[in-house]
C-alpha cells in the first residue's frame, strides 16, 4: 500500500487507490502526511492525521476509491492551490473531499464513474463565466451539465471541472403579450411543466419528467405535441449563452443567427454554455389521453396497422407503441391536443383510433381528459426519480418496418425474463407538422422520418450490466440492416460508433456547416466531449 501511495503522489493526474479492508487498521505515510483508515469506524472514514502537503480526497465510500490530491503537484497546468482558491470566486463548489461529492459527480445513469477535480454548482451566470475563465487560463478540461440525464457521459469528465446548472432552475419571466416564457437552463421537465400548466401554458416538451430542459431542447425534444407543434427546439426564439471567450451574448434570428441555427439540434456541449431559453408557448387548458393494451402475441398485427396510421393521422394526435416483454401487454398510448371542448375531443379521438379499434384485439382501452400536469405525470409514470443503470440505442425510421424487422423486434423482446420489466422498445410516431420543417432549417436533420425507435435495457445493480448490455447489442445488431439511412438522435448518443460516423448519423448534411460554425465560435475546441463537433484544426 505504501508503494502504491508513493506512486500515486508522483502521478501527473489525480489517481485512485484501493484499500485492503481485511485488516482492521492501515497506517499510510508519505513525506509529512499520514493517513489512517479505521475499519472499526462505522462510517468507514479516512482520518487525516497530518496534512501539510497532501490533501486526501475521499468519496463517501472508501471501499470504492479515493483520491490523493497533492498541493505540490500541478494538474493540467493548474496547482491544487489554485483549484482550492476557486471556491472564493464562485457561489458553490464541490471538491472530492466535500460531503456530497459522490452524489454530484454522478449522472442519472450510474453506469459511468467519473471523477472531476471540482464541480461548480452554478447559481448565476457569473459563476459560469468565472469557471470558464479559470479553465481557459489553466487549461483544465470542462463540461457543462443541465439535468444530468444524458445517456452517455458527455457532461462528465475525469480530472476536469463540471459546471452543474441545476441550481438555476427557475421560470424567469412569462410574457403574456408575446406569448413567450424564459426558463433557466438547469430546470427539470417535471417541475417546469407543473408550474406552466397552472397558467394554461403548453410548450412541446418531451415525455420523461426527469429530463433536463437544456439537453432536451438543444438536441431536439420529442414529445406528445410533436406532430402539431414540432420539436421542443422549434419553439425556441432566444438563448442566452456564454462563449468560449467568456463573452455573454444572445443567439436568435437577429443576433448570432448562425449560432442560433446550430444550437437548435447540435447545441449540447459543442459551441457554448446556454444559460437561458426563451420559448414561444400556446395556451391549453386540457389534453385527452388514450391507452390501449394488447396481448404480446398480437404485437405484429397491431404494429403493422399502427405504423402506417400514426404518422399520418390528425396532427393534433401523437402516439407511441411500447413493447416490454412477453409477460406484459403491448401498450399504445398518445395525446390529443385540445379542441372546442373535452367532450368533442373524446369523440374525435374515438373516431381517429378507428384503425386500431377495428382490429378488435385490445384487452384494455381508456380515454381520459386531464390537465397538462396530469398528462405529464401520466406519461411519466415510466420515468425513474432515482438514478439507475441503463444502456440505449435508437434509430430514425423513414419507411414502414417490413415483416422481417418486426419479427426481429418480437423475438428479442421475447427473450427477456419476467423480472426484466423495464426493458423496452419504444416507437414514437413522427410526421405531421414536424415533417413540414425543412431539414436544414435547424441543425436537426431527420425531418422526413416517420418513426423514432428507442431500445432500452435497464438494471438495478452493477453485476447485471454485462448480461443487460449483451442482450441489447445482439438485438441491435440484428435490427441495424433495416435502417440503411443510419440516422440517429443526438439526444441518444451512441458511443459504440466511431466519432465521425456518429456525427454523420446525428447531423446528416448539416455537419459541414456545423463544423464551420464551430470554427467561428470555438476554434480552439474548448467545448468538447467524445463525439463533439470538431473545429477544422481537429477534424480528422
Residue ranges and their predicted role:
Residues 2-540:
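Soluble FAD-dependent oxygen oxidases
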Amino acid at each position: 500500500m505504501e508503494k502504491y501511495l508513493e506512486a500515486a503522489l508522483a502521478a501527473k493526474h489525480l489517481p485512485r487507490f484501493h484499500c485492503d479492508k481485511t485488516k482492521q487498521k492501515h497506517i499510510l505515510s508519505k513525506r509529512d502526511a499520514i493517513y489512517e483508515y479505521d475499519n472499526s469506524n462505522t462510517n468507514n472514514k479516512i482520518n487525516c492525521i497530518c496534512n501539510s502537503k497532501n490533501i486526501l480526497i475521499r468519496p463517501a465510500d472508501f471501499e470504492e476509491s479515493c483520491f490523493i490530491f497533492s498541493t505540490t503537484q500541478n494538474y493540467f497546468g493548474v496547482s491544487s492551490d489554485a483549484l482550492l482558491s476557486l471556491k472564493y470566486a464562485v457561489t458553490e463548489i464541490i471538491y472530492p473531499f466535500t460531503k456530497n461529492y459522490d452524489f454530484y459527480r454522478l449522472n442519472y445513469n450510474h453506469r459511468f464513474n467519473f471523477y472531476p477535480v471540482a464541480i461548480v454548482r452554478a447559481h448565476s451566470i457569473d459563476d459560469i463565466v468565472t469557471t470558464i475563465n479559470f479553465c481557459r487560463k489553466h487549461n483544465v478540461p470542462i463540461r457543462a451539465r443541465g439535468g444530468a440525464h444524458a445517456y452517455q457521459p458527455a457532461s462528465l469528465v475525469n480530472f476536469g471541472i463540471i459546471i452543474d446548472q441545476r441550481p438555476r432552475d427557475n421560470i424567469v419571466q412569462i410574457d403574456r403579450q408575446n406569448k413567450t416564457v424564459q426558463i433557466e437552463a438547469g430546470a427539470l421537465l417535471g417541475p417546469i411543466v407543473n408550474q406552466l400548466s397552472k397558467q394554461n401554458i403548453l410548450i412541446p416538451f418531451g415525455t420523461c419528467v426527469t429530463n433536463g430542459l437544456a439537453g432536451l431542447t438543444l438536441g431536439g425534444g420529442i414529445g406528445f405535441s410533436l406532430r402539431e407543434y414540432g420539436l421542443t427546439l422549434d419553439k425556441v426564439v432566444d438563448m442566452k449563452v456564454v462563449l468560449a471567450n467568456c463573452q455573454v451574448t444572445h443567439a436568435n434570428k437577429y443576433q448570432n443567427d448562425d449560432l442560433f441555427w446550430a444550437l437548435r439540434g447540435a447545441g449540447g456541449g459543442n459551441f457554448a454554455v446556454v444559460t437561458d431559453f426563451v420559448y414561444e408557448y400556446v395556451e391549453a387548458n386540457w389534453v385527452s389521453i388514450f391507452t390501449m393494451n394488447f396481448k404480446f402475441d398480437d404485437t405484429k398485427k397491431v404494429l403493422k396497422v399502427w405504423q402506417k396510421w400514426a404518422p399520418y393521422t390528425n396532427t393534433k394526435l401523437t402516439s407511441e407503441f411500447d413493447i416490454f416483454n412477453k409477460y406484459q401487454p403491448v401498450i399504445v398510448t398518445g395525446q390529443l391536443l385540445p379542441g372546442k371542448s373535452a367532450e368533442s375531443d373524446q369523440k374525435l379521438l374515438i373516431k381517429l383510433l378507428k384503425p386500431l379499434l377495428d382490429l378488435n384485439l385490445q384487452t384494455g382501452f381508456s380515454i381520459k381528459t386531464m390537465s397538462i400536469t396530469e398528462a405529464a405525470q401520466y406519461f411519466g409514470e415510466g420515468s425513474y426519480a432515482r438514478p439507475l443503470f441503463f444502456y440505449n440505442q435508437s434509430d430514425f425510421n423513414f419507411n414502414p418496418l417490413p415483416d422481417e424487422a418486426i419479427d426481429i423486434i418480437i423475438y428479442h423482446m421475447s427473450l427477456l425474463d419476467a423480472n426484466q420489466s423495464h426493458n423496452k422498445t419504444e416507437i414514437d410516431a413522427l410526421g405531421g407538422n414536424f415533417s413540414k420543417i425543412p431539414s436544414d432549417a435547424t441543425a436537426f436533420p431527420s425531418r422526413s422520418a416517420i418513426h423514432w425507435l428507442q431500445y432500452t435495457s435497464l438494471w438495478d445493480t452493477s453485476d447485471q450490466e454485462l448480461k443487460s448490455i449483451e442482450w441489447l447489442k445482439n438485438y441491435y445488431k440484428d435490427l441495424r440492416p433495416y435502417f440503411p439511412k443510419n440516422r440517429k438522435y443526438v439526444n441518444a448518443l451512441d458511443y459504440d460508433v466511431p466519432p465521425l460516423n456518429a456525427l454523420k448519423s446525428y447531423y446528416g448534411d448539416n455537419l459541414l456547416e456545423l463544423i464551420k460554425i464551430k470554427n467561428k465560435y470555438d476554434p480552439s475546441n474548448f467545448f468538447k466531449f467524445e463525439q463533439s463537433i470538431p473545429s477544422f484544426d481537429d477534424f480528422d
